[in-house]
Amino acid sequence: MASYATLLEKTRVPQPSIQRFAVISVFSKLRSAPEQFGSEAEAGREAISFCLTSESITVVDQSVHELCRLVSDSVLDLSRGLLELQSALEGCDSKLVSLFVKGLGFLIRIGYERNNGNWKFNSTENHPFVRIQSSRVETQTELLHQVSLFVMHNRRLGMVGVCEFLEPFLNFTILRIPLSDSSSSLFARELISSMASLCCSSRHEALPIFRLLMRCLKYIPGNNLEVIVKILVDAYTVVVRDLVGTGLEVTEVHLLGVQLVDGVLFLCASPHVQTTEQESVIESLKHLLAVQKDLGLAYSHDLSLVVLSLVFMLAKSTVEHEQLCILKFLLFLLKWKTESENLSVKDAAGSSVESLLLFPITALMSSPSKSIKVAASKVLSIVENFLVTVSNAPKIEVHTSKGDSPLSRVGSVVFRFMQQLWHQNDYTPSTSSFLRVAYTNGSEKQETYLGPVTWNSLLREHAERFWDKKKLSASFCLSQEIPILLGAVAGVMVMHPSLGADAIGSLTIIGGIDSKMSVPLLLAVLYFSNLLSRTNVPCQSLLSKLLGLLPSLAAQQVMIPLVVQTITPMLRKDAKGLLYATAIRLLCQTWVVNDRAFSSLQEVLRPQGFIEYISERHICISMAASIHDVCKRHPDRGVDLILSVQACIESQNCPVRALGFQSLSHLCEADVIDFYTAWDVIKKHAQHIKLDPLLAYSVCHLLKWGAMDAEAYPEDAENVLNILWEIGSSMQKPHDSQWTKARVSAIVALGQYEVSFMENKFSDFNKNCTYLLFSETNAEILNALEDLSIKIMIHEHSVRRRYVREKKVPGSKIEKLLDVIPQVIFPAGKEIKTGELPGAALLCLSYNPRDVKFGSSRSFHDVHFQYEEAFRVVVKSLQLSRNISLALISLQSLKAFMRRWMRANILSIDATTKELSSDKTSKATNNIMKSLVHMAEEALPRCAENIALALGALCAALPAASHNIKASASKFLLSWLLEHEHEHRQWTAGISLGLISSSLHVTDHKQKFQNISGLLEVLCSSKSTLVKGACGVGLGFSCQDLLTRTEASASSDIDSDSYRNQEERLLGRIVRLLSSILHGFLHTPCDILESLSALFPPGEEDNVIGLPQLLDESSDDFDDDTWGIAGLIIGLGMSVGAIYRAGKKDAVVKIKNLIVSWIPYADSLKQTSGSNSKVSVRLFSVGSCLALPIVITFCQKVELFDAHEVDDIIGCFKDLISELLIVRKSGALRKRLLMASCIGAGDLLGSVLNEGIHPVKIESVKELLELFKKCYSGLYPPVAHFGGMLGVVNVLGAGAGNLVYSHPRPRAPPASSEENEISYVSGPLLSNAYFTQQLTPVVQEIFLIAQNTKDRQLQHYAAWAISILRTYMRSGESSSLSNENQSDDSDRNSISHNVPEHTMVMKLAQGLTNPSFPLAGSPLNIGTMASALRCLSHAPRLPNLDWGATIRRLMKQETQTDVTQSGDVPKEITLREECFKFSLAHASEFDELLAFLDELSELSRFKALEESLQSCLLCHLGGLMRIFSGSRMNKLFDDVSCFVVSLSSDQTYSCDQKSSLRVSCWKGLSQCLEETSLESSEYVTKIEKCIELLFAVLPVASQSPRADQMGSVKEWSEAVTCLQKSHRDWLYKFLQVSNLEPGNEKTNFQGDLKKIQAKAKLAKLGSVPFSELGKLKAIILNCEESDIWDVLIEIVAALHHAEGGIKRQWLIDAVEISCVSSHPSTAIIFVGLLSSICCEYMPFLNLDRSTVLSDMSVTVTSLLSDPSYEVVTEPFISFLWTSLERVYSFATESDANARLSSQQIAQSERDKAPMLVKVMHYICVAFRDHLPLEKQLRLASMDMS
């Protein structure tokens, strides 16, 4: 600095000229000095600093000039110059400030020029103008001048660039206003004013400056906005006048003015803006538009947004002069619009935002200000024209431009919602709304809301919730504008051609939301009444509906006089009749709302009125209806009108009389009037009620109240009952709906009287009621009769006699005969050896320990030895004669013998030891097993055959859990089966081995497969046809236990699945081999056998054996062929059950048809290729006769057997047996065929009769019995005699030789059964009184033959046959092995269901069980039968009838085409469903009903049911659980699991049917969870497994379901209900979600989404705490929005019902997660959703992805302005700012830079980022006061263009 010292010293000289010269010299030297002494050197810097910091103004002034010259000449760097001047400015004296500011201004202009107008700074703080302003306050004056100079100097470079350069400075100036003193505010105003002045001076370059100032408006504090707007408007008016005058940029300046007005109003009408007086702002904006209009500019349709903002401001305003100002503005706009020359009808409709003004303007008509009323009326007159135009052009689409801003405003949201309502066919939003989400998804009213939901219903729910909150917190209230805006929408919709009525309902709801709306609504009613009365309005029909709104306004006490005053003019005597009648009804409804109106109403309802207006029908009816309403709602008030009630009854007008009777009925109901006293007065007016159905209905409605005092007035009560019965039983007009209503009323009235009283007054009352029910077809009347019948049954049960249980006495001669058979056949005193009657001995001999002593084992050995010796004798004498039929009968008898033997052993062990039941059974069976094996080792062939059968019988009689015994027996029999050299061992061993396989335990898979494999091996390898046939029978037995368990199907366990596959393969091999062998024996082509083989193709592991190897070509033994082929056919017939379970129903039908075709003389019934060979058919006929009953029995159970087939097949058997009896040829085939046909015919007939499905002709039964009698009494071989006797026995149900199906013991016929001549019989013959008498001689005859010792062989067969019948009749008494196993079967059967004949239960039961019951009529219709079943389902007990047969017949009856179907019966109600429900109700009492339910629940049978019955069964899983055993329920749950899994891929169901079935399954599982307890863990595990499988196929819940997706809504509803009832620990574990990764194969993304949705729904219902849902925040909000949209909505719907603290926490957490999430749009959209559903404007918001973000400008700002959310506003805005910076950086940088700087944001967010930034920026600006200044500046610096 030394080199400059001399010159610097001269600057201190107090001489200005010397000082200036010194400064010039210093800077000249700096300019020319070498580098080490230049301006950049230390000495140079110090010299410059010395000059600038001088206290002399002259020195500083010259220094600034010289410094600027250095910079201008590029000697000094610009930044250095700015730095020097800025530093000097900050430390200078105040008098020097202007000098430095001027210098800085000059340098800024130079810098801008050098950068060609593109001078940018990295932050607002570095902006030179900002630095100047920030340095000190004194700079402001000069700074304004420098800014103007900058603009004027640099405008040549482009005004747009100049404005961009100044924008940060302008924003900084504005943003500093709230943080500094008033000078900052003043400076900002002056700065804006200065720039506005520049616009005036540079009119052709003014538009960019205007745009700059408009962009800054959003940062201006509200108290400064008024002045700023006035400045801008004044400047604009100058500019626009000039530009329009010159014709330049007219369009741009026009649009700019509209944008300015819209932008200012957008700020003023924002929800977060506090209500302040904005009159001057509005006046300024109006002035701007007035200038445009004066200049001739056209009305812009963009002004529709201005109107929308004014609508909101008008609704929100409470200040009169502000309201007046807005009205004047609106009036100006509307006039301008209507004066526009280009406005057409379409334009008016397209810009119909003005229609929203209707209700707010009407509301202002109640203002006390005359000026407001005048202005409002002017606006209303113009709006009315728009409204009428819109109502006449409802199909024109409405659009509104949103200008440059995509952000919503309250007005646009309301208008958009109104548009959507207008352009649809109902009041249901086409897209889902937030109201729907809030109040229908998963709520307690979800069932109500399935399907379309109207805005009315949702709004009503919203209003109810509002009042609930209001009750909890008195401070809670809605903003003033909400009900007005709701009214604005509804007011427009009133004019809709089809939705006007719903809109009026909405107005009613709005009145309930805010009591202050009563007067506006009254004015709206008056206005619309006037408007709708005009001819040019197409909605005149709404007038009455609109007037109906008046009474609802009377809820406010102050409104009563106004409402009554409004109605009163319509009650003038000269008024029109219809108007007068309407006024009466309105006044009545007003009284309903508020009792203060009663005096006015009472005056109108005077009795004289009916005389005065006798010719005015409408008025009289209106008066009567009002009287009726008063009596119904307030009986005490009704007493005041009693004379008017009497006048109604005495009227000649039927509707008036009817209403009078109804009014009196309500008074009697309330007991304010005595019924019989009133009846004495008015009964003369009820004499001709049958002439008018309405009158009859009303009188019946009255007469039911006579029940209370009927005993006190018996005569009058009897007359009343006669009237009711006469009307109720009248069928004069069966299809008249009015008479139907009257009859229902009469029957309901009868139900009010005591049953005992009616029985005393009516003879045969029950019979008449039953006849009436069975003769009725109308569904409504049937329902009423059901209720009456149920009441009668309950009464009968309550007064029933207490029957004493007496010792059972045989009820018929047949039973008496059967009871004495053991004593007669084996008398104690005679020596009749067991070996002479071996068959009877097996069934009758019984040895019981009589001298058993504790601790003694002698009795056990004695009894065991007795049975062993008897068995030795029997096996030696019982000849099977290589007859498979005899073998089966012997096996059946041996099973009974083994059961008695075991029972005796167990009883003996009971007396000697105290062991467990299973141990006793095992010990007793082991002893028998040892004895049998010991005897078998050295037995003769005949004995060996029987012993092999005995082993099978022993195992069949054992419990399934006896593994060891059955395994030992199987091993022993397998060894015999494989001894090909011993045929006598092989063939019976094969039969027994199959029987054992059918009774193995579920876990004995290996043993079962070994047995079946052994049978298949011998079937293929044996050369004996008899052995092949026996193996066929054994395989048939084995099929009974194949594919019976389905836990494998529903399990993911590989071994279980493999087990089922093995069973399917084994079944295929069995059917394939049997078909192939039979085909070979047939020697002719047979399509059915070939198709059966094709249905079960061989597997890879099968050894395909050729047909020649399967057949023994050298076998010429005709006897072997007959029984061998019979065995194969029987085996094939036995396999139908397994085939059906395998899902091959067609194969079952084919087998049935094939076997029928093999019966001789059946060719006319079924034709099958290859059946023409007589020899083949004769060989096959024996087996087909024996197999057919088995097949038909199964087909009956699964409904594959038609009624018309019964008579045909029975006829075939009759013809066959008749032919065989007539032809006297001898021969083995003939006698075997005769035996087989008799056994088969009897078994078939017995099966058909016991099932009870198909009635059989009486003559056919008699003819068959006569043929059987001829057979056993004629000169035929003994085996034929045996067949005839077994035919008789089988007809009675004994099922001799049939080990697959057994029939329940027949019930004794009713003691008082009438022996009427009948043509058909249904049910067991022994349960029929007529046939019991007919059969007694037949049984006696067989009994006598069994006593005849002349023919021992015949005696043997007779004794055996009669013993089989005795065993069958005693089957219910001795079916268990031990006393403890006889749980309740015997008790249940012994319950005395003594129901008298005259009772209602018996009459109904007889009508259903007996098709020929006299009361039933012919034919019964389905609806009638269903009603009778429903009645009996409620019966406390049923008579002891054959209910199993009845239900099966009714099940079949509905599917028959000849059954009448009432047209009144709803299609969804089916007789089959009622059969199921009836069975479920009484299955605990009747075993046959339990068996019926067991069959229906079997998976294969269940799959064949119709969809409606499947749904019904699934819905009642809980009921089944109450009656099924534990093991059966386990199997049922496994079946359900299997069905659920298979349902998804089943093509036989439609999507709706699948959904319906799943819904039913959810309902059933819910029932099961209610029935189970925590202790029944096994059930719970099974249920939970079903839930998991159902949940897996549950569709992801959609928040906007289409009409075809409503099934999924129902599914979710039931699923959530079910999950609510599940155990909490399991539920939390099941719904646990660890991560959400779409596309990741390791995770089930869709399943996880459903779990989250389920958890949200449960949280909404309070079943799961919100803390559980909160654990998933981070997982959910880090996913892409498109993947989880529905999940987000579900969570928001749940949070809507949460506490405020939970909502606020979710709001904060969501925006915080957006700061780190790779998908920030998801979190922000979630914030938008949550804000939408929680803010006040929720009723107007549609749930649309495209609008959620844009609506956040309304929803979030509204929510954060709520006092309850103010506590979270600051942290929310802080996190939102952080997220905004992150997303803005991502959106503005290139892809490469974005990856580096914002690595966590996914690239899929790039398209959403601009909109995200815009929304977040707007919210941050709106709440910028919660951000520090530096963040506000960065916020303002963000480019939003």
Swiss-Prot record:
Keywords: Cell membrane, Cytoplasm, Lipid metabolism, Membrane, Plant defense, Transmembrane, Transmembrane helix. It is a multi-pass membrane protein. One of its GO terms (biological process) is defense response. The keyword Endoplasmic reticulum does not apply. One of its GO terms (cellular component) is cytosol. SUPFAM superfamilies: ARM repeat. Residues 1374-1393 are annotated as: Disordered. The keyword Membrane applies. Its main location: membrane. Pfam families: DUF3730. Disruption phenotype: Shrunken non viable seeds due to arrested embryo development when homozygous. Alteration in cuticular waxes with elevated amounts of cutin monomers in leaves. Susceptibility to the obligate biotrophic fungus E.cichoracearum and increased resistance to the necrotrophic fungi B.cinerea and A.brassicicola. It is found in: Cell membrane; Cytoplasm, Cytosol. The chain crosses the membrane at residues 250-270, 296-316, 347-367, 479-499, 513-533, 546-566, 943-963, 982-1002, 1123-1143, 1175-1195, 1229-1249, 1277-1297, 1719-1739. Expressed in the vasculature of leaves, petioles and hypocotyls, anthers of mature flowers and siliques. Expressed at low levels in roots and stems. Involved in cuticular wax formation. Required for the synthesis of alkanes from wax precursors. May play a role in acyl-CoA reduction to aldehydes. Is repressed by FREE1 and functions downstream of FREE1 to negatively regulate multivesicular body (MVB) biogenesis and vacuolar transport. Together with CER16/RIPR, acts as a cofactor of the cytoplasmic exosome and connects the cytosolic RNA exosome to the SKI complex. Acts as a post-transcriptional gene silencing (PTGS) suppressor. Interacts with CER16/RIPR. This is Protein RST1. It comes from Arabidopsis thaliana (Mouse-ear cress).
